[in-house]
Curated annotation (Swiss-Prot):
Annotated InterPro entries: IGPD_sf, ImidazoleglycerolP_deHydtase, ImidazoleglycerP_deHydtase_CS, Ribosomal_Su5_D2-typ_SF
Domain of life: Bacteria
E.C. designation(s): 4.2.1.19
Record localization: Cytoplasm
The protein's name in its UniProt record: Imidazoleglycerol-phosphate dehydratase
Record pathway: Amino-acid biosynthesis; L-histidine biosynthesis; L-histidine from 5-phospho-alpha-D-ribose 1-diphosphate: step 6/9
Family: Belongs to the imidazoleglycerol-phosphate dehydratase family.
Biological source species: Rhodopseudomonas palustris (strain BisA53)
Length: 197
C-alpha cells in the first residue's frame, strides 16, 4: 500500500497530511486559505492521489508559513509513500491548457530535488492569496518529495488560470510518473539500481 501520513508542528503551524498514491483523487483539505484549498483539491482530483490536509497556521501574520509548511509535509508524504520507488514510471511531461493559459510541466522522480519554475503573474494577489506563494509551495513540495520538477507557463493573462494550470499540470504529471509500469517487473527505474544521489 503506497500510503503515508506526516505530522509537522512548529511555532508557526500545525500540519497533518495523508496521501494514498493509489487512490481515486478524494480530497479533504482545510488550510484556512480558500484559494489554496482550491489548488490542493485540484491536485488531488487530477493526480488521482487521495490527499488529506489539515493545517492550523499563523494566518494573522500572512499565508506564507502555512503554504510553505503544507508543501513540505505533502512532499515528505509523497516521498514516504513512494518507498523504494520500485516499478514506478518515474518520468512524465505534458502541456496543461487553462483557457488562454498554457503551462508545460516535466517531472523526474529521481530522488534528487530540483525546481525550475517560470511563471509570471500579472497580479500580485489572487483574492487575498499572494501569487509569489505559488512558487514557494512548488519549491517546498519538490524539495521534500525529492523530485526534479520543471514548471513553465508559456503564456497566460489571468493569474488564477496561471496558478491553476501549474497545479493541474503537476497533478497530471505526478499521476503518470508515480504509476506502476507492469513491464518494469518491480525494478527501480535507474541503471544505478537505486534512485537518489
Amino acid at each position: 500500500m503506497r500510503k503515508a501520513t506526516i505530522t509537522r508542528k512548529t511555532k508557526e503551524t500545525a500540519i497533518e497530511v495523508a496521501v494514498d498514491l493509489d487512490g481515486t483523487g478524494v480530497s479533504q483539505v482545510a488550510t484556512g486559505i480558500g484559494f489554496f484549498d482550491h489548488m490542493l483539491d485540484l491536485l488531488a482530483r487530477h493526480s488521482r492521489i487521495d490527499i488529506k490536509v489539515k493545517a492550523d497556521g499563523d494566518l494573522h501574520v500572512d499565508y506564507h508559513h502555512t503554504v510553505e509548511d503544507v508543501g513540505i509535509a505533502l512532499g515528505q508524504a509523497v516521498k514516504q509513500a513512494l518507498g523504494s520507488m520500485a516499478g514506478i514510471t518515474r518520468y512524465a511531461s505534458l502541456y496543461m491548457p487553462m483557457d488562454e493559459t498554457l503551462t508545460r510541466v516535466a517531472i523526474d522522480i529521481s530522488g534528487r530535488p530540483a525546481l525550475v519554475f517560470k511563471a509570471e503573474f500579472p497580479r500580485d494577489k489572487i483574492g487575498e492569496f499572494d501569487t509569489e506563494l505559488v512558487r514557494e509551495w512548488f519549491n517546498a513540495f519538490a524539495g521534500n518529495a525529492g523530485i526534479t520538477l520543471h514548471v513553465e507557463t508559456l503564456y497566460g493573462e489571468n493569474s488564477h488560470h496561471i496558478a491553476e494550470s501549474c497545479f493541474k499540470g503537476l497533478a497530471r504529471a505526478l499521476r503518470a510518473a508515480v504509476a506502476i509500469d507492469p513491464r518494469a517487473a518491480g525494478e527501480v527505474p535507474s541503471t544505478k539500481g537505486q534512485l537518489g544521489g
